[in-house]
Amino acid sequence: RCRVIAVDSRLAPETRFPSAHDDALAAWAWVQEKAGAVAGIDPARMAVAGDSAGGNLAAYLCQEMVRARGPKPAFQLLLYPLLQFADIRTKKMSPQESGFFISASLFEFFKGHYLADPTRSMDRRMSPLFSPIEDLRGLPPAHIIVCGWDPLHDEGLAYAAKLRSLGVHTTEREYSTMEHGFLNLTHISSTARLAARDAGIITGKALGAL
């Protein structure tokens, strides 16, 4: 068993970049300071997790802690994460463009609502896949889940390969028949339930809880 702290970050279009990224850092700082007293949590045994855009925030948070030499999470769980907004065309060229739930063209829509300045898409906060190598070395261990029917499929695998090449302990699991967001379907999908269970076991082992 573990305690879970769910963070509500500000959303676009009411607030734009980098509000959600700032919120992720603020939440991490608060948890580091308060978790022990409030919830009896060991700050040295905390993981971060996020799906889709939340996976972007989790990946960025880990990189920022490396860059700033701050307290790093012990583990990162990235669920079909959004890891680059630099070139939406790479999503469109992928066979996974025809995903049932979400498409690359929809990411163009998201990008326009979050980024007031489209040239910021190469900012390391928006595209952690392309962050400098010095921000990637020393990252906490990672487990990355990707889906077969998802325009984010390729960048998830690319990030896993990149982290491994830099000595970061990284595993990935591909659910080839599933689509983006499938972990929200545990009430109707046995595959989603199995994936959620496996992700929990992997995280628990990484934190020394299993």
Regions found by a protein language model. Name each.
Residues 1-210:
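Alpha/beta-hydrolase superfamily serine-hydrolase fold, recognizing
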